[in-house]
Each structure stands twice: as C-alpha cells, then as structure tokens.
C-alpha cells in the first residue's frame, strides 16, 4: 500500500541517517537548506539513529546541551521502530554481504533494513557505504538542493 501511495501522489519519504542529523545539528548549511527544501515531505529517522545520537551525546563534552538537542529532535521527527520485517531483512542483508566478502556495521544494516521495509529514501553522506545494498534508495543532503 505504501508503494502505491508514493507512486500515486509522487511523495518521496525520507529516513535521516545519523550522519545527516549530526551535520544538521552542527549547522551544515547544505543539510539545513535541504531540510527546508523538503519541509513538506515526510522526514523520519530510525530508533537506531537515536541510539547512536544518545551514545555520542553521553561521550561528548557537552552532555546536557546535546541531550536537549536530541529531545527536540525526537519531538520533531517520526521515529521508525525496528519491527519483525526489518529484523528479517537485516538478517538477509548481512548474509548476502558476508557471502560477497563485504561487511557493514550492524546498526547501519538495521537502518538500511528499516528504510527498505518502509520504502524510504535513506539520506546519508555515506553513499559508498550503503550503495552495496540492492534496492536501497539514497540521497545526500550535504549538497545544495536544485531549485
């Protein structure tokens, strides 16, 4: 149903990877401009990304400030959870990559699995990293959007 809706209405839905959110929080102008450019598009993130952000906040020098930024982010984005379908896709992807002698971090594979299951375009600066996953749609918002 989700794929049909996207085709009918031409809506692209996005899943922000951890690096894209970090670029935004650090004031990257291109990422911030893309967020504004896509303000009317559904933009989501994954619970795994939040885990990585919390880890980074707690190991940082500015724990309180970084935690506050994450709390604000949680309120402004829909958070995709890891469901049974994503778990199965994760296992399949990890197996396929290992058979070809390639590996990706488990968290990255889970994020990719969530994007695939929910038919979301993964917004990341790690395009080389994720392009090994067949069928995964990618976007890089560290480049300025075309008007």
PLM regions: where:
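Short, well-structured N-terminal submotif of metal-dependent ribonuclease cores
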Residues: 1-45, 55-72, 144-147
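Active-site neighborhoods of divalent-metal-dependent phosphate/nucleic-acid chemistry enzymes
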Residues: 2-11, 78-125
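Generic structural signal for small/hydrophobic residues in well-ordered secondary structure
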Residues: 17-18, 53, 90, 115, ...
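Alpha-helix capping/helix-boundary segments
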Residues: 20-21, 49, 86, 128-129
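Short, polar loop motifs at secondary-structure junctions
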Residues: 27, 125-128
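Residue-level recognition of specific faces of alpha-helices
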Residues: 34, 47, 69, 76, ...
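Residues at the C-termini of beta-strands that transition into short coil/loop
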Residues: 47, 83, 126, 142-145
